[in-house]
């Protein structure tokens, strides 16, 4: 339940830009497509034994087909926009409650990013994997 709530809140924060579509990654895997941003919780584990806090690893994937974006500029712009929308929360410039609302999040951190070009059934894709950590306390 909490994983779905976290995913939903992040998806809402990323929606509203006509350049890309935001979808949920149900099987916690990368989803490739033309200007697609997918969000999913990879795993959740107890952060501190004996305390009601949990650490969730969240993946945000950004993908774009090379055939539709030969310079990669659209892909780069979408990646920058996705990171910009979440950065104010990871840098604590905005309260976490304004992003996660009723979900009791006490920490939100950007962990790492990885960008690559991959081949799939539709041809070459640009792919970015942005990884975040969410700490909740219930």
Tell where the protein language model's regions lie, with residue ranges:
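Charged, often glycine-rich, active-site loop that binds/positions anionic groups
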Residues: 33-42
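Charged, amphipathic alpha-helical segments and their flanking helix caps
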Residues: 1-25, 29, 42-138
């Amino acid at each position: 339940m909490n994983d779905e709530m976290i995913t939903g809140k992040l998806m809402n924060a990323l929606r509203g830009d006509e350049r890309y579509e935001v979808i949920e990654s149900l099987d916690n895997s990368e989803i490739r497509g033309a200007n697609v941003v997918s969000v999913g919780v990879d795993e959740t584990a107890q952060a501190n034994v004996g305390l009601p806090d949990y650490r969730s690893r969240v993946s945000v994937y950004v993908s774009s087909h090379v055939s539709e974006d030969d310079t990669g500029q659209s892909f780069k712009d979408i990646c920058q926009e996705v990171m910009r929308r979440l950065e104010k929360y990871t840098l604590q410039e905005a309260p976490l409650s304004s992003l996660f609302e009723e979900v009791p999040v006490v920490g939100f951190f950007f962990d790492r990013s990885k960008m690559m070009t991959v081949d799939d059934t539709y041809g070459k894709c640009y792919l970015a994997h942005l990884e975040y950590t969410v700490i909740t306390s219930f």
